[in-house]
UniProtKB/Swiss-Prot annotation:
Gene3D superfamilies: 3.30.190.20, 3.40.50.790
One GO-annotated biological process of the protein: regulation of translation
Chain's role: Binds directly to 23S rRNA. The L1 stalk is quite mobile in the ribosome, and is involved in E site tRNA release. Protein L1 is also a translational repressor protein, it controls the translation of the L11 operon by binding to its mRNA.
Name of the protein in its database record: Large ribosomal subunit protein uL1
UniProt gene name: rplA
Native source organism of the sequence: Borrelia turicatae (strain 91E135)
Length: 224
């Protein structure tokens, strides 16, 4: 939805586009200029200085959760399938579940697989890849530690990744949350992101950071 209209313009007029705001001031300002009734999500957009061969992708567990619990689907057999069920996975299976997904089933938010299942799960690449759900070692979703992985996902472990333009868009809270909790989530995300700086990158890693609410204008963050 395009961000336009009188209320948006009024909100935009309160943002100094030439200023970089501290994270505390940015969160406060976004709440001050809020003009919709629903509980907006607070997002950050990070512009990275990356080369074409660079990939930035990882996961983070935010200290203050705000999203609904993810529906976890696990591809596993035998004892590992039972481990996944006991850990709280919503959907667990092997060949039958693979065929179900091939048939159009998509009522899940995250996919985990044991290594021995990947030969068959790989055939779902066109389906899962399109949604960014293909199991991957970098996101710890190809694993034999199903109990630990599922527990982490249920606590809110969330993936972040740079797109082809070197931009990461990531949600850090809701407008209804305490400012300090939003800040703690932001700080944790940035801490984990900085660990993913490519080893051969010269110069600045983070070019700029902006914060915005769902319907509101963006605010530039003073990132040092």
């Amino acid at each position: 939805m395009a961000k336009s209209g009188k209320k948006y313009i009024q909100a935009l007029s309160k943002v100094d586009k030439l200023k970089s705001y501290s994270i505390d001031d940015a969160i406060s300002l976004l709440k001050e200029i809020k003009f919709v009734k629903f509980d907006e999500t607070i997002d950050v957009s990070v512009n990275l200085n990356l080369k074409k061969n660079h990939t930035v992708r990882d996961t983070v567990v935010l200290p203050n959760q705000f999203m609904r619990e993810k529906r976890i689907l696990v591809f596993a057999k035998g004892d590992k399938a039972e481990e996944a069920r006991e850990a709280g996975a919503v959907y667990v299976g092997d060949d039958d579940l693979i065929n179900k997904v091939k048939g159009g089933f998509s009522d899940f938010d995250v996919v985990v697989a044991t290594p021995d299942m990947m030969k068959d799960v790989g055939k779902l690449g066109p389906i899962l890849g399109k949604r960014g759900l293909m199991p991957n070692p970098k996101t710890q979703t190809i694993t034999n530690d199903l109990k630990g992985t599922i527990a982490s996902l249920k606590k809110g472990r969330t993936e972040f990744r740079a797109n082809k333009n070197g931009v990461i868009n990531f949600s850090v809270g809701k407008s209804s949350m305490d400012n300090n909790k939003v800040k703690e989530n932001y700080d944790e995300f940035i801490k984990e992101l900085l660990k993913r700086r490519p080893s051969d990158l010269k110069g600045t890693f983070v070019d700029s950071v902006y914060m915005s609410s769902t319907m509101g204008p963006s605010v530039k963050i003073d990132f040092v």
